[in-house]
Amino acid sequence: GTTSRGLGDVYKRQEFNLRGAMSAAHQVKPDIAIQIDLMLATDTPETHDYGEMELGKGPGMSLFSFHGRGTLNGVIPHPSLVDLMEQSADLKNIKLQRSAQVGVLTDLSYIQQLGNGVASIDMGFPMRNSHSSLEICNINDLVSLEVLLETALSNITSEFSLIRS
């Protein structure tokens, strides 16, 4: 089962060393972790071979990420959280894009391994030109992501199950 301790915000420094959220997670001991970040848009001629994430087509959900170098790992999301996000998107008529990328790493890669494991999922919005002075996103994707997350979080109650079937 799931124990509900309430929801809260934890702010951290991802770009520092990709382990910024681990300190907070050790203290909070979460059952669920949702990483919110950009998702690399692949809707330009030079990026279309790297995926199917487009600006203006809704928020994104990562179904697989892996850094691909050394001991850096990635995330395969918990099935209950995938279902929750899909159901929430359907409920609000939000287009939900799916992503699977190599070369991507977030703090969630480490948080998911704490204790007996933390149910995890990476959510985000498509962005072009990451880490440049010309980052581009579609404001409607951000608004839809906000609505999606509000809806999903409101459905994480004491009855929400993290048991894998």
Name each model feature, range by range:
Residues 1-7, 11:
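Single conserved hydrophobic/aromatic residue that forms the stacking wall/gate
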Residues 4, 25-28, 53-54, 113-116:
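Solvent-exposed alpha-helices and their adjacent loops that cap or buttress functional pockets
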Residues 12-17, 38-40, 127-129:
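Acidic, glycine-rich active-site loops and adjacent beta-strand->loop/helix elements
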Residues 12-19, 101-105:
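Active-site glycine- and acidic-residue-rich loops that bind
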Residues 18-22, 44-49, 109-110, 133-134:
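Short, well-ordered secondary-structure micro-motifs
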Residues 23-27, 46-61:
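Short, surface-exposed, charged loop/turn segments at secondary-structure junctions
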Residues 25-45:
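A glycine-rich helix N-cap at a beta->alpha junction
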Residues 60-146, 152-165:
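Active-site-adjacent substrate-binding region
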